[in-house]
């Protein structure tokens, strides 16, 4: 589920950037090719400005809502084990404790005194 949310988040971000770039600016840039200046276009005499503005607002709202949802999921995600590689620190501590128990006791003489 988390990966699906991230994928949707990235797709919405890319589409928002695309919609912002094709909107008609002061110089009628790329937005004019989508019906910004002609009345016989697919969007009608109003042009693409109204449609593109509404779509941008809708996707921006979805982007912010998805940000909150991903933040909420991510904050609760750390409490749940997902797979066998999630808790490697506990496994490392168990191995170190087992090595301390299994290690033979080596009698060491005072190594500070030269022989």
Swiss-Prot record:
Highest taxon of the source? Bacteria
Q: Which InterPro entries match?
A: SecG
Instruction: Indicate where this protein resides in the cell.
Output: Cell inner membrane
Keyword list (alphabetical) reads: Cell inner membrane, Cell membrane, Membrane, Protein transport, Translocation, Transmembrane, Transmembrane helix, Transport
Q: What membrane topology does the UniProt entry give? A: Multi-pass membrane protein
Task: Output the Pfam families linked to this UniProt entry.
Answer: SecG
* Example GO molecular function: protein-transporting ATPase activity
Q: Name one GO cellular component term.
A: plasma membrane
Q: Which GO terms describe its biological process?
A: intracellular protein transmembrane transport; protein secretion; protein transport by the Sec complex
Transmembrane region(s): 2-22, 51-71
**Family assignment from sequence similarity:** Belongs to the SecG family.
Alphabetized PANTHER family for the sequence: PROTEIN-EXPORT MEMBRANE PROTEIN SECG (PTHR34182:SF1)
Biological role: Involved in protein export. Participates in an early event of protein translocation.
Q: What is this protein called?
A: Protein-export membrane protein SecG
Which organism does this record belong to?
Pasteurella multocida (strain Pm70)
Q: What is the lineage of its organism?
A: Bacteria, Pseudomonadati, Pseudomonadota, Gammaproteobacteria, Pasteurellales
Which gene underlies this protein? secG
């Amino acid at each position: 589920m988390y990966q699906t949310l991230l994928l949707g988040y990235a797709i919405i971000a890319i589409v928002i950037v695309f919609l912002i770039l094709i909107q008609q600016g002061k110089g009628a840039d790329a937005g004019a090719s989508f019906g910004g200046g002609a009345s016989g276009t697919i969007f009608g005499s109003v042009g693409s400005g109204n449609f593109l503005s509404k779509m941008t607002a809708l996707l921006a709202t979805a982007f912010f809502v998805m940000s909150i949802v991903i933040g909420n999921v991510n904050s609760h995600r750390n409490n749940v084990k997902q797979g066998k590689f999630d808790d490697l620190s506990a496994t490392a501590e168990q191995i170190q404790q087992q090595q301390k128990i299994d290690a033979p006791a080596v009698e060491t003489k005072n190594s500070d005194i030269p022989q």
